[in-house]
């Protein structure tokens, strides 16, 4: 079955280690191959069985089925490409859009050099790096949410409308409701 190692309590080295709370590897049953040689296959086969079982019992589609004869009105990338897509969509010059996309990793690489932090200082007290990270996260979320909206609402996220648009909407509703 397995190899079991019995401790020799007359061994002075083992007694000294046991007095310090060490020496646990001198006795007991080793994990390899006794335990792990049957735990690994059980876990792997169990994971495969659960995956196949869920796929058979609940076959849910991922997204809409593809229709090669109908092109969608607006083609959107996957959600994790939304900020990049929004940059390319809003910048009029495509070369400038590509340069802006390249400046994001270049700017991220320069953030650690903005502050002088010695090795004994708390790394969590870095106000410039923290501010740049928070602003970068907010801008990425703003660009990502804006990419899912139509182009005319993408920069304001549909939260703000100009007074002219609001007045025209009011006039249109007044016109149609006056005939009801």
UniProtKB/Swiss-Prot annotation:
Annotated Gene3D superfamilies: plastocyanin oxidoreductase, Single helix bin
Any one Gene Ontology molecular-function term assigned to this protein's record: oxidoreductase activity
Listed transmembrane segments: 36-56, 95-115, 131-151
Keywords: Chloroplast, Electron transport, Membrane, Photosynthesis, Plastid, Thylakoid, Transmembrane, Transmembrane helix, Transport
Family membership: Belongs to the cytochrome b family. PetD subfamily.
Quaternary assembly: The 4 large subunits of the cytochrome b6-f complex are cytochrome b6, subunit IV (17 kDa polypeptide, petD), cytochrome f and the Rieske protein, while the 4 small subunits are petG, petL, petM and petN. The complex functions as a dimer.
Name of this chain's protein: Cytochrome b6-f complex subunit 4
């Amino acid at each position: 079955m397995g190899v079991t190692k019995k401790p020799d309590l007359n061994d002075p080295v083992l007694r000294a280690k046991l007095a310090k709370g060490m020496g646990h590897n001198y006795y007991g049953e080793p994990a390899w191959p006794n335990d792990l040689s049957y735990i690994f296959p059980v876990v792997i086969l169990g994971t495969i069985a659960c995956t196949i079982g869920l796929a058979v019992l609940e076959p849910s589609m991922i997204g809409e089925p593809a229709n090669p004869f109908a092109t969608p009105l607006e083609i959107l990338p996957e959600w994790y490409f939304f900020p990049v897509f929004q940059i390319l969509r809003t910048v009029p010059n495509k070369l400038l859009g590509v340069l802006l996309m390249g400046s994001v990793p270049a700017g991220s690489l320069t953030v650690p050099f903005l502050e002088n932090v010695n090795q004994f200082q708390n790394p969590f007290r870095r106000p410039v790096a923290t501010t740049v990270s928070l602003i970068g996260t907010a801008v990425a979320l703003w660009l990502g949410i804006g990419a899912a909206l139509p182009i005319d609402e993408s920069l304001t996220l549909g939260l703000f409308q100009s007074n002219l648009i609001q007045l025209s909407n009011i006039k249109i509703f007044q016109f149609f409701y006056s005939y009801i």
